[in-house]
Amino acid sequence: MRTSAVTLPLELSDVSLRAGNKRVIKDLSCRFTNRPGCSVIIGPNGAGKSMLLKLCHGLVAPDAGRITWAGGSDPGRRGQYQAMVLQRPVLLRRSVNANMVFALKSKELSPGERDHQVADALARAGLSRYAKTPARRLSVGEQQRLALARAWAVRPELLLLDEPSANLDPAATHLIEEIIQEAAEQGSKIVMTTHDLNQARRLADEVLFLHRGRLKEQAAAADFFAGPRNDLAQAFLRGELLWWRRRSIYTPDDNRKDS
């Protein structure tokens, strides 16, 4: 396992973000340490899960607040140590192997080292036999595995995954989860979003619960699933959040005092 990285932690302090006229992230503060493992972000649709990942990776800049990586705020510096896989990954219109090689261009590797890392990542993703196949000819699940293998090949300290198994069948989901678990075991910090609570239970060491752009709870997974402290999180786990909303506990504006 890789030794603890010196560049983490990643910290967000009072971060807010607007999309048009809507605040999608609201005064959010959280911290991701350099401890290898998997932090899973959950919450209902529109909670801001994907946008939080984009903020972490520097794909979007906050309107307010501060995001620091080991005390620095340069998104380019974060990009040297992070990798992100979008829910709909962007792949080159080239072979599987060419996609992998492209991801490693920024690394100072000898041709032998590069080829070894490519072969290793493809083998772990179950894609070795497709090395010369155009990426566009892969199935949706295979493309997702390629995107994940490509991100992991650069050996990131922080790997950000947005719904990595969305719309995949159980077999493909199982392969994706194996890759995630192995990346964590190899020393990467994983931060991912999911709508699948069972998947969160299987993978998470830590859970973050978002609701309407606000972080309601961040806790060890065992503690969270044993019983969240936050009322909205409790309702979410019971599948009762829609009913909870209809009770009109909070007002519709940004100043509502939800639990």
Per-region residue spans from a language model:
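A short, surface-exposed alpha-helical micro-motif characterized by mixed small hydrophobic
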Residues: 200-202
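Helix N-cap at the start of a conserved alpha-helix in ABC-type nucleotide-binding domains
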Residues: 170-172
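Helix-to-loop junction immediately C-terminal to a conserved catalytic motif
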Residues: 57
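H-loop/switch region of ABC-family ATPase nucleotide-binding domains
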Residues: 194-195
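Catalytic Walker B motif of ABC-type/P-loop ATPase nucleotide-binding domains
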Residues: 159-162
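Conserved ABC ATPase signature
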Residues: 134-138, 142
